[in-house]
């Protein structure tokens, strides 16, 4: 099943020069040769959010490798980009081993129930598929989130830091807050009707009944506590413990 969000990450380990530059297609569909906009050594981190990127860079500066940085940055995106990332969804982790020139991929997409029938998205009343949007946000589309297990597997196999250490920077961002930008505010505005249906999301994303203003500080103390609880007790706390029970009380 493909429920809520998807998160794709790429971790690259290399000892060669890191060169970053835009790639544009020519009229014939081939990339044009452009002058690099940045050149450096030691590593690079790129995400859609400056706070998450800064977390990844800090991990590298402290001696972590690309996998450590990718996991820490991804966990931070769960705070700053909750509409497209986070432990409530799934995704893929792509790792390139430069020494052996081999690509490894962890499939961490969500899994549906083992008893799920093939026609679960067909309305038995008329034999027609349910409306896509209705089916997407209903209980029919719920799957077991794979993101957290993916991070743990990647960290154990290729990283140099335990998952607990890689979750703590994200927990600090969630507790201290991050600046709201125009994109974050617009994403909340686009989902305001849905957020307004629940007290928890209304309080978090609609303070005073409206999306937070650009430039204000957004905090998520509950997510900070969740990350720290998982860091202290392990991922079983999410999948088999109290956090999981809160997610699925049935």
Model-derived regions, located:
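Secretory targeting and sorting signals
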Residues: 1-27, 151
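Noncatalytic scaffold domains of N-terminal-nucleophile
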Residues: 28-54, 66-233, 238-240, 245-250
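Long, structured ligand/cofactor-binding scaffold of large enzymes
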Residues: 58-60
